[in-house]
């Protein structure tokens, strides 16, 4: 079972970093650079996750997915969204076939 509270603690830290000096905080520097910089990090971590998977490197898959989740959480926070928003969407989709879920999307 996933420890959802660790995600909430990370989210709280990310919120605090919005107020931090960009020269003293990596996350604050990402926020200061804006959406493009954050998206670039998410894309970079997604690519690294794919490379680890293609290499069948289990340890690196976990490391890279952790980095991907982290930077995805930075992106969520940047837009005023939270882990709870994502969890709510997972709950909404639970038990729905992927094909049916995609058909239900408006765009």
UniProtKB/Swiss-Prot annotation:
EC number: 3.6.1.31
GO MF terms, alphabetically ordered: ATP binding; phosphoribosyl-ATP diphosphatase activity
Keyword Nucleotide-binding: yes
Subcellular location per the Swiss-Prot or TrEMBL entry: Cytoplasm
Pathway assignment: Amino-acid biosynthesis; L-histidine biosynthesis; L-histidine from 5-phospho-alpha-D-ribose 1-diphosphate: step 2/9
InterPro entries: HisE, PRib-ATP_PPHydrolase-like
Primary location class: cytoplasm
Keyword list, A-Z: Amino-acid biosynthesis, ATP-binding, Cytoplasm, Histidine biosynthesis, Hydrolase, Nucleotide-binding
GO cellular component entries: cytoplasm
GO biological process, one term: L-histidine biosynthetic process
Catalytic activity: 1-(5-phospho-beta-D-ribosyl)-ATP + H2O = 1-(5-phospho-beta-D-ribosyl)-5'-AMP + diphosphate + H(+)
Domain of life from the UniProt record: Bacteria
This protein's record includes keyword Repeat: no
UniProt signal peptide: none
NCBIfam families in UniProt: histidine_hisI (TIGR03188), PRK00400.1-3 (NF001611)
Entries under PANTHER family matching the protein: HISTIDINE BIOSYNTHESIS BIFUNCTIONAL PROTEIN, HISTIDINE BIOSYNTHESIS BIFUNCTIONAL PROTEIN HISIE
Annotated family: Belongs to the PRA-PH family.
Protein name stated in the entry: Phosphoribosyl-ATP pyrophosphatase
Organism (species): Azoarcus sp. (strain BH72)
Name of the gene: hisE
């Amino acid at each position: 079972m996933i420890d959802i509270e660790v995600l909430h603690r990370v989210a709280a830290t990310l919120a605090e970093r919005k107020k931090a000096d960009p020269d003293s905080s990596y996350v604050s520097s990402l926020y200061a650079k804006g959406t493009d910089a954050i998206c670039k990090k998410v894309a970079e971590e997604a690519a690294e996750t794919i490379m680890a998977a293609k290499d069948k490197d289990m340890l690196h898959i976990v490391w890279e997915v952790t980095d991907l989740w982290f930077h995805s959480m930075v992106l969520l926070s940047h837009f005023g969204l939270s882990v709870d928003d994502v969890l709510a969407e997972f709950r909404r989709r639970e038990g729905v076939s992927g094909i049916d879920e995609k058909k239900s999307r408006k765009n």
